[in-house]
Amino acid sequence: TDTALMADLHLKIQPGTDVMLFNAMLHVMMQNGWLDMAYINKYTEGFDAVAKGLVDYTPKRAASVCGVPEGDIVTAATWFAQSNRTLSLYCQGLNQATTGTDKNTALIALHLATGQIGKEGSGPFSLTGQPNAMGGREVGGLSTLLPAHRELNNPAHVAEVAAFWGVKQISATPGASAVEMFDQLEQGKIKAVWVACTNPAHSLPNSQKVARALQNAELVVVQDAYLTPATVQYADVLLPATTWGEKEGTVTNSERRISRVWPAMPAYADSKNDWQIVVEFAKRLEVELQKLGVESPRLGNTSNAFMPY
């Protein structure tokens, strides 16, 4: 890659061996006394178990598994631990993998163990893979996370979000992942799916299973700016969305700065911003729910819940 060509040290590891590399680096740091024990004792839990598990992760073993020289692993560990500021930039190679959680955890452990986190110029910095992916997380775009980085497994956070939404309670049970969702769609456990800003018939693993799931669904709604995505052919309802140059709202960029975005041109024909489509649907749903005696939530101001806004 262009970045690798400019690197002072390129660790050209075998695919899928990231965790071995990171653990070996932490092993080197531990053996040389380069850990920030004051930070570890004050801000982390479970370090003794981690240290015990690192005994066999020698740089020699990692070199044979990862396919890189042992000396390069030691060099990487040295630079990481002894630099005044260490910043890790990573993207889909760590995030979108069958062991993605393990990869992220191992890298973050390097920062926690050396205190290279929570200060200017340091920290694990996930770039994510799509524009405004971070913005989606901030407003609750994940099935396992509440808005404004509130955790589902924290009762205080759940109560806080419920109060903000103006409802008595919300489910603290994490939702399904994208793969799990389509498994349940195929099995009939999920009856309907609303696809927005993605193309699962093309991008999800096991495309044949995804196709069967979409065919089995009682209702498929696709919200997209184009007619060409593979998922469109399964749509019962197609909602025309605007492209990036026609949208207004906010975007959270790679440095986590939130920017106000204005459209460069008017929306084409009857297309609407994604958020406008959701709001219009919610208004219509509210009318139907009121007929059933369901009380409508009263939302608070976003900036009151999430200070960056």
Task: List each model region and its residues.
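Cofactor-pocket helix-loop regions in the catalytic cores of large enzyme subunits
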Residues: T1-N132, G136, L152-Y309
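Surface-exposed loop and adjacent secondary-structure segments within mature catalytic domains
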Residues: N132, V139-A148
